[in-house]
Amino acid sequence: PEFEKVLDIDIKAAAETALGKELTQNLLSVVFDYDGNLWFATGGFRIYPERQQQGVLGYIAHTAIESILNGEQTDLSKAVFVYGLPLGEGAENGIAASKDGAVILTNQNCYLLRAEEGVNVVWCTPYESVGAKVSHDGDKTTGGGLAWGGGCSPTLTPNLVLFTDNADPVKLLALDMKTGEVVA
């Protein structure tokens, strides 16, 4: 199959304009939600909290995307919404979308976000991490984990958000999709 590029948006530049400052992390992941908003996360592997890196989560409103696809001029400054994470926090993997919103796993928390003329944090659930792992002679496991945090993208069911933490030993966590409460 052949693909045709139909949309070209500099998401990082649009997010920097919305924030009013330069981003120190790259665009890491994007996903469309059920309403057609394009969610994004900045980050990278091994975002060490003590290094004070700062990621952002956000979206481009579906109305702007539709306008651009229809060949219309669009003011992205009114259509890009961002949520600046605390210093030391950023995404390290993919993101997912459900009817309830966008689910984004950072190196410290799992978020459910909704697009409501801005980024609405529905819930934020912290999880355990032992940080970056390094293997030594005689270790039974390798330290080859790519991420400081969970190291996976969230998996969604109609009622649950599933992901692994970065504890020792690693655990599979199940969160209630509506509340963010750890249920298993």
For each of these PLM feature ranges, what is it?
Residues 1-26, 31-184:
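Extracytoplasmic/lumenal domain signature
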